[in-house]
Design a protein with these regions (language model features):
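Bacterial N-terminal signal peptides that target proteins for export
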Residues: 2-11
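Pyridoxal 5′-phosphate
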Residues: 16
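C-terminal motif of bacterial Sec signal peptides marking the signal peptidase cleavage site
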Residues: 19-22
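Periplasmic peptidoglycan-binding/tethering modules of Gram-negative envelope proteins
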Residues: 24-85
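Extracytoplasmic/secreted proteins, especially bacterial periplasmic and envelope-associated proteins
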Residues: 66-73, 99, 107, 111, ...
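A non-catalytic structural micro-motif
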Residues: 83-91, 106-137, 150-158
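Short beta-alpha junctions and helix-cap segments that line functional grooves
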Residues: 139-142
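A generic structural micro-feature
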Residues: 144-148
């Protein structure tokens, strides 16, 4: 039963990767300021001036102070744009097994979802998708690359 769930999740992630990779745009450069990434290189940038991603410590899904502030800004924007739905993509760095990182990415995306819901954003407007370590923003194998890859990204779904 557990193997079926893992295989189902792996299949869903693969399909999602294929669908989203067909929609990919060219990446723009960004930089880290504390634990906030200031780039806008997602499929669709959430909103001008509002960061689209939050970052996590190694093996953690606990939101930092900076991450909570970013999500608060996202919630404000989402309240003003009540017809918008979003996908929260959970990611992990390359270390650890594929299964572990898929679960960790899901916990990270759910942490962001739970926080947005405390600001009145309906769960009906938020989908969660974990990519684990399958979609790194930085393919390096070093602490800086890993810190960029431990993230949850908010993507506009409609």
């Amino acid at each position: 039963m557990k193997l079926n769930k893992i295989l189902k999740n792996a299949f869903l992630v693969t399909v999602a990767c294929l669908v989203l990779s067909a929609c990919a745009t060219s990446k723009k450069s960004g930089q880290m300021q504390g634990d906030v990434y200031t780039g806008n290189d997602t499929v669709e940038y959430l909103a001008s001036g509002v960061p689209d991603r939050v970052f996590f410590a190694t093996n953690e899904s606990v939101l930092t102070t900076a991450s909570r502030e970013t999500l608060r800004k996202q919630a404000t924007w989402l309240r003003k744009n009540s017809k918008i739905t979003i996908v929260l993509e959970g990611h992990a760095d390359e270390r650890g097994t594929r299964e572990y990182n898929l679960a960790l990415g899901e916990r990270r995306a759910n942490a962001a979802k739970d926080y947005l819901m405390t600001y009145g954003i309906s769960s009906d407007r938020i989908s969660v998708l974990s990519y684990g370590k399958e979609r790194p923003v930085d393919s390096g194998s070093n602490p800086l690359a890993w810190s960029k890859n431990r993230r949850s990204v908010t993507v506009k779904a409609n």
